Amino acid sequence: MFDTDTISRFQQIETPFYYYDLGLLRQTLEACKTASDKYGFHVHYAMKANFNPKVLEAVQSYGFGADCVSGNEVTTAIANGFDKSKVVFAGVGKSDKEINIALDADIFCFNVESVQELNIINDLAKAKNKTARVAIRINPNVDAHTHHFITTGLDENKFGINSWQLNDVAETLRSCKNLQFVGIHFHIGSQITDMEVYRSLCIRINEMQQWFEDRGFQVKVLNTGGGLGVDYHNPDTNNIPDFESYFKVFKDFLHIKPGQEVHFELGRALVAQSAALVSRVLYVKMGQKKNFLILDAGMTELIRPMLYQAYQKIENLSRKSEDRSQKSESESQISNLKCQILKYDVVGPICESTDCFQKDVELPESFRGDIFAIRTAGAYGEVMASRYNLRDAIQSVYSE
Ligand code: LLP
């Protein structure tokens, strides 16, 4: 991702900024498209992961749909070229204003998360003399002892409709004349790398599909949600997720009926590896107990490490040639003569103790002005940035 030319280019640019490798993004999208096309699967990009216009432009150019979670995302998706017939709208708290935006835009469907929401969408559609297509988001409520997907799938989660409410759902769907039932929707969590979890999801989807069919509903769409994870530890050697194995699980374990569509809502897997947060060292504080590298980026630019204790690889690009992790043992012995490897807490400038990207990171001895990259920052990075401390809005730089 960072050749010498790119690193010298960074030296001329004010930091911090997000760097997007658009070539890698396209390769990732291509890999996903090829793997999903093989089975005729439909992918909606979960644009909450990143709605940078250049990212949206690339994603939509491959013909993916958009999975939106606000009225603004619906409007932005369509304004950026996504086909409205491939836009879905999820979220536990859709406001009337947002539902109206989506009705006016004639999107493909609402992923509905409560019985009350079904009634509201029906009323608003009726007022416009329209029919709203709806899919029911089901909370799988799976016992953690037998299945792995506990992240969003239990009764105490706010997401989705619990199975004990499904009779109400069926009744409401029958009585609401301005709703058209298209299918069932699930989303069990994010950063899932164990394919066994998806196998368990398939079993649950099959059961739910049967439940609806037994009651006379035709399930045209099976929407499995998103969640495919990426390798945060190896952003160079494992930068494109294994889409083939992922889709194959669904091909093998879902009971797909003739004419039925299978939908996916991938966010992170499509965009995470294609960007890094680039920052400079402002100050180096060498202490008796701790050494601190104080960067000019902090939790305001990338909050995942602070909010979720998430690991994102940190590299000193200015001393990349000296980085022991990039070299063979003999090479690193030679370079260790020149450069020391030290442990640092890599922190930001924000007035919060939690503003720390990672503690005790082993790095080549680093100096004021060194350029750092925090890798795998393309998903839930730029979009979660804030202006706290009245920081400048974060800028973006793109590969040529
Ligand atoms: N569909 C639904 C209904 C979702 O709630 C999400 C993500 C996705 C699809 C896309 O999931 P993905 O493929 O990106 O895993 N900010 C957190 C992640 C929050 C995910 C929220 N929902 C993070 O930085 O790890």
What are the roles of these predicted feature ranges?
Residues 46, 133-139, 185-187, 223-225, ...:
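Short beta-strand segments
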Residues 1-132, 171, 176-180, 210-217, ...:
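A charged N-terminal "starter" segment
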Residues 321-340:
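Arg/Gly-rich low-complexity intrinsically disordered repeat tracts
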Residues 4, 260-320, 338-400:
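Charged (often Lys/Glu-rich) extended helix/loop segments that serve as interaction or gating elements
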Residues 56, 79, 99-104, 121-124, ...:
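Short acidic, glycine/serine/threonine-rich loops at helix termini
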Residues 67-68, 111, 135, 185, ...:
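Conserved beta-strand positions in the central sheet of alpha/beta enzyme cores
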Residues 141-283, 389:
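Active-site loop/helix belt of alpha/beta enzymes
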Residues 51-54, 75-76, 143-144, 190-194, ...:
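Flexible loop/turn segments at secondary-structure boundaries
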